Amino acid sequence: MRVQSFLLAATTASTLLACDKQADGPSPMAPNLAARPSGFVTSQPAQARVLLPQASLKPILTVGDPLPGQEANPDPEQRVWAPIPDGLGAYQDGNRLILFANHEITSSGVDGKFPFARVSRLQLDPATLSVTGGSYPITGKATGFLFQRLCSATFAGAAEGLGDGWFLTGEESVTGGAEGIQLAVKHDGSETRKLPALGRFAHENYIAVPGVPGKVVLVGTDDNSPAALGSSFRSELYLYVAEDAAAVLAGTGKLYVFKAGLTNSGQLTTGEPISGSFVEVTGAGALSATDLQTTVDGLGAFKFVRLEDADYDRHPGHSAGPSIYLVDTGNINARCGTDACDLFGSIYRIDLDPADPTQNAHLVLLARSRGVAAGDWASPDNIAVSGRSLMLQEDPAYAGFNRPERIWNFKLGPHGSLGDPQAVAELETEKFTGNVCLEPAGTCWESSGIIDASEWLGSGAWLFDVQAHTLPFRYQDGQNQVSLSREGGQLLYLRLPGS
């Protein structure tokens, strides 16, 4: 998932409020979908559909499509858009929109092709939503830079204290040769840094959060599963604090983990905040994923079931300091009564103290799913937050999930509360494959990577991608066409007025 970075950290509340009240009509950057594209636009049909009459969407790029500017690249896998698109991050460069995308690939690839995770960097014409260029800052081929399952992501720049900007991404895997390392890709794609000081764990996302004077603050979510590091449900919330961008990149900041009077998320009551703090994890950069888990267990870290994505609040007045929304995908096998308990997924909010983000934190359970059988959203994975609302994407993750995978919208209310959920879009799994989404049958897709794109594409604009896990795709290798049996996908534009 990913976050962008163009609201200045020192912007006044009145300016932010003005942004929040922007009109729903066209803006200077709003795309004209009827205009002749200046670059490449996929010819493939949309892999999702809207559920509301006022919403609209458009496919931009499909897995296997050619990347403009890479026609002469000797590597056929770098001439096309790679499978399993995931976390996104974007920034504006003149009249271009630069969009980074993770590709959540393992070392084995897809049918033996595309081994290891990649990061693509696309150049988009925001006026026509067409692709004018593309490349791979992380290719999946460079010795020393072979990674697995790059998941959610964030682009952080000057607003968050990271200068010209870095695309933050990390390995979700901590087994099978993966170490669970956090990465930063420079805005122009010229450099990739490993950031071991941010901790080795199953990285879902690390977001940079403005609002703490004189510090760069990052919040990380641990997407740990019982199969990875033991049998219990123990997923943690991390905080990294550094003096400036150089300190983040050099690893001279400090890593902390959240701790509270309660021990796990199953003990929370909806709407009732608890107090906690972040305790330092000494020597974090030298710890393996297993050693880090042992260390934070010893520190009494608060346990979630399986944290997923996070994003920070952009609405003024919700709290006195930085606030972060985060989701837990839950697990139907969670041991309620003895361990962290969250069967179908939850949405949380944590408020930080701007004077000292490690102290006086307040965590609140905003909503907990009752599962799809009750008509709820479920298995939340990726989120994005605008000044008006929160978007949530589902990744079907439990037996009994038996309907199309959806994107949901929650209006933000007073003090950061959530309005009633509204289903905005759903994936076209059955239309493309003939199979309904059903777990654990393995027929489900997922949408991912959603970001608020209103800054560049007009009010109510979002970008997201689809991981079409059971959909075959093709790509061109010279005179030959290569067919792969699974892991199609797509990048799409979504507009929901008022969001």
Where are these regions (language model features)?
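Sequence/structural signature of beta-propeller domains
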Residues: 21-499
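C-terminal motif of bacterial Sec signal peptides marking the signal peptidase cleavage site
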Residues: 16-18
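Hydrophobic alpha-helical targeting segments used for export or membrane insertion
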Residues: 8-12
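Bacterial N-terminal signal peptides that target proteins for export
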Residues: 1-7
